[in-house]
Structures are given as structure tokens and as C-alpha cells.
Design a protein with these regions (language model features):
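Start-transfer (signal-anchor) and selected internal transmembrane alpha helices
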Residues: 1-42
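Transmembrane-helix motifs of polytopic, lipid-linked glycan transferases
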Residues: 28-30, 113-137, 170-178
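Interfacial juxtamembrane loops and adjacent helix segments
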Residues: 56-106
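Loop-to-helix entry region of an early transmembrane alpha helix in multi-pass inner-membrane enzymes
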Residues: 85-124, 158-162
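Membrane-interface transmembrane helices that cradle and orient dolichyl/undecaprenyl
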Residues: 134-137, 175-191, 201
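Short helix- or helix-capping micro-motifs
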Residues: 142-150, 177, 198-202
Length: 212
């Protein structure tokens, strides 16, 4: 009987180690892949908007003056993804949460921080998703979650550029985790934390939160 118990214990330990090594291997592989294939923000349309808006947020504030817009007061001189204010200034149309985070990254790391911001957020996303699924549903659920996210070509392609997808998904996953924990424990502070993550995710990608 003791021999069987020891044998099962060794098998379980070996199984856990294999799962852990597999998870670490996937994370390391996908991290090197996305960091090695990032696209500078000035080479894309939406990523250029988010990158420049982040820089302007630090250097000039959330609004941007436009002499032609102030003089002629017509939308013909309004740039894509920008809105005109009553004072004939321009403000970003969307993604203010990412612009704020991008501005903070730009202050500390300059242009290189904006280059790597979205890939780093993607790496944090897959790690946070794996840990969330593991804590809530077990180690195999965490492994499956990690595989599905790492194999998502759409999420990977969006994350090599300065887009909103990785940050939105990260905030939504964290909000969902605390919401589920609230349902299990009925601790009121968890619903507050969950609401904060959901609220901030709406500043990153409003259309995404509406779809969910």
C-alpha cells in the first residue's frame, strides 16, 4: 500500500513538473518571438496615431493645436482618429487609456519604450491569463489557455504593433478574475477591484467592452 502511494506521489510530482516546464517553454518561446518581430509604431496607421498621441500627451498635453483648424474652423484640416473641440483644437478619438500608458512609458524609456510596450503587454497578458485559469480551474485549464493565446495569430499580429488589444484583454481578464472571486467569496472589495479594471478597459477600447 505504501509503495502504491509513493508511486502515485512520484507520478503526480512528475506530471506537475512536466506541465510547469511546458508552460515555461511556451512563455519563453512566444516572448522571444514577439520581441524579435515588433513593428515600430511609425510604420503603422493606428499604431502611429497611438504613438504620436502618447508623445504629444507628454510634451503638449491631451489637446493639440492646429493653426489651420483654428483659422478655417473646418474638419478638412482634421487628422484621422482625432476629434475637434469647441476651441478648434484636436483631441484623440479613442484609446486614451493606451495613450496614457504610452505617455508614461515614453517618459521613462523614450521611443524604445513605445516600440516594446505592446509586446511586453502581450507577454504579461499570457502569463496573467495562465495564472488566472490555473487558480480558478486547475493546471490543465491554465495550460490550455496559454496554448490558445500563444497560438492566436490575430492577437499576435496586433501585439507586435502599438495597438489596444493586449492592454484591453489584460484588463478584462483581471476584471473577470476578481469578479469570479467575488462570486465565490462574496467579499465586497473584490467587486470594487473588478469594476476598476473594467472601467479602465473601457478607456482603452470602448467598442471591445460593449461587445463583451
Amino acid at each position: 500500500m505504501k509503495i502504491l502511494i509513493q508511486k502515485n506521489s512520484k507520478n503526480n510530482k512528475l506530471e506537475k513538473n512536466i506541465v510547469k516546464i511546458t508552460k515555461i517553454g511556451i512563455i519563453v518561446f512566444i516572448s522571444f518571438s514577439i520581441l524579435g518581430q515588433f513593428v515600430p509604431f511609425f510604420e503603422g496607421s493606428n499604431s502611429y496615431f497611438y504613438g504620436m498621441a502618447s508623445i504629444l500627451f507628454v510634451e503638449e498635453g491631451i489637446t493639440k493645436s492646429n493653426p489651420f483648424l483654428e483659422k478655417y474652423e473646418t474638419n478638412e484640416f482634421l487628422l484621422d482618429n482625432w476629434l475637434r473641440t469647441d476651441q478648434n483644437e484636436m483631441i484623440p478619438m479613442s484609446g486614451n487609456g493606451l495613450i496614457l500608458l504610452g505617455g508614461i512609458a515614453y517618459v521613462f524609456g523614450g521611443y524604445f519604450a513605445l516600440y516594446y510596450l505592446s509586446p511586453i503587454l502581450f507577454i504579461i497578458l499570457i502569463i496573467a491569463s495562465e495564472r488566472t485559469a490555473t487558480k480558478l480551474f486547475g493546471k490543465y485549464a491554465g495550460l490550455i489557455t496559454l496554448i490558445l493565446l500563444s497560438a492566436s495569430n490575430l492577437l499576435f499580429r496586433n501585439s507586435i504593433q502599438l495597438h489596444t488589444e493586449s492592454l484591453f484583454c489584460l484588463l478584462f481578464v483581471l476584471g473577470t478574475y476578481f469578479l469570479i472571486k467575488f462570486g465565490r467569496t462574496n467579499q465586497s472589495h473584490l467587486i470594487l477591484i473588478s469594476s476598476i479594471f473594467f472601467a479602465f478597459s473601457s478607456t482603452v477600447r470602448l467598442s471591445g467592452i460593449i461587445l463583451f
